[in-house]
Amino acid sequence: MSPTLLLTEQLIARPSVTPDDAGCLDLLARRLAPLGFACERLDSGPENFRVSNLWSKRSAALSGQAQAATKTVVFAGHTDVVPTGPVEQWSSPPFTPTHRDGRLYGRGASDMKASIAAFVVAVEEFLAATPDPRLDIALLLTSDEEGPSVDGTKVVIEQLRARGERLDWCIVGEPTSVEQTGDMIKNGRRGTLSGRLTVRGVQGHIAYPQLARNPIHQAVPALTELAATVWDMGNAFFPPTSWQMSNIHGGTGATNVIPGQVVIDFNFRFSTESTAEGLQQRVHAVLDRHGLEYDLTWTLGGQPFLTTPGELVQAVQQAIRAETGLETELSTTGGTSDGRFIAQICPQVIELGPPNASIHKIDENVRLVDIEPLKNIYRRTLEHLNALAGA
């Protein structure tokens, strides 16, 4: 069994459902410390939702290669996994790593314990071949990415920024591939902005509408306009910004009562062509123009970020090409990731991991043939970046 596969299985065997790390970070710290990594725990959150965070960094100064402008590459990942769902529906126990049909089954197999294991082993191999690297290498790992994402990477980034930590390149180990490891990487993500709109009316008997004011009827024209609005046209890297309703709550449950209010939840996934502030202003303008009596609360889940083709993208592309022969596709599709926090202090962020077809599903799995190539791509990327750091 390869070291990468063995470490992946050891991580899967730890039932690390958010925010419980279940010992994953301790296991990883024990692997990293002998390589010269300084391992720092930056746990955060209340006792009933305590989040485990690890910042682990190896400085080029250890080998006397540090320069005033030494660059840092960081791998970002999460040890937490989503709940299993009905255990009886799994073909094998979700936290018992199981091989079947050329695949490794278990919760977290593809999201994202294979990626973490692959990077750790890639670092081991890289340092064995390059004992005096010219770049700093770091790992930022958390047990709160699948949950609220309040006390995880976000908190660590705030602390790193406060003490002036420099990050130049970041690889997030999210499962980005489609059919084969390396066929797609994410070089950005859309922003996410949610709103909860409460439209107030006057409750009354449905047979006497003249004595009431139906908030649903009042809201519909405004909602129709919002749904039809073209917010932007997107650009070469992002699709157009989208606005979608997710929930509508109104009524008392009775069929003869006009409700006193209706609550609508909605979400923007927005490109770099729009700003959160601009979208908020445009929504308020529509609601005001329709004369609604309303309250609206906003939650900004993350700003969009984009890494244009440059040092990091090219290093990863070269590594993928050398390992697999693939010309990888750059994409900004999909949901959010912790990359949105890291991009605040790191100018180049990409995401690369195994295929994502089974993530969050019953019988989550990763193909065995996708694991070693991922490790090799990470190692080759380190080699490319090390050459850049010494240029």
UniProtKB/Swiss-Prot annotation:
Residue positions annotated to bind Zn(2+) 2 are D111, E146, H360
Give the pathway listed in the UniProt entry for this protein. Amino-acid biosynthesis; L-lysine biosynthesis via DAP pathway; LL-2,6-diaminopimelate from (S)-tetrahydrodipicolinate (succinylase route): step 3/3
List of residues binding Zn(2+) 1: H78, D111, E174
Domain of life of the organism encoding this protein:
Bacteria
Query: What single Pfam family name could you report for this chain, choosing any that match?
Result: Peptidase_M20
Provide any one GO MF term from the record. cobalt ion binding
The annotated active site, in chain numbering, is D80, E145
Q: Which UniProt keywords apply?
A: Amino-acid biosynthesis, Cobalt, Diaminopimelate biosynthesis, Hydrolase, Lysine biosynthesis, Metal-binding, Zinc
Q: Which cofactor does it need?
A: Zn(2+); Co(2+)
EC no. given is 3.5.1.18
Note on cofactor: Binds 2 Zn(2+) or Co(2+) ions per subunit.
EC class of the enzyme, as a word:
hydrolase
| GO BP | diaminopimelate biosynthetic process; L-arginine biosynthetic process; lysine biosynthetic process via diaminopimelate
Role noted for this protein = Catalyzes the hydrolysis of N-succinyl-L,L-diaminopimelic acid (SDAP), forming succinate and LL-2,6-diaminopimelate (DAP), an intermediate involved in the bacterial biosynthesis of lysine and meso-diaminopimelic acid, an essential component of bacterial cell walls.
Quaternary assembly? Homodimer.
Q: What family does the Swiss-Prot or TrEMBL record give for this protein? A: Belongs to the peptidase M20A family. DapE subfamily.
> What is this protein called in UniProt?
Succinyl-diaminopimelate desuccinylase
Species source reads: Acidovorax sp. (strain JS42)
Instruction: State the encoding gene.
Output: dapE
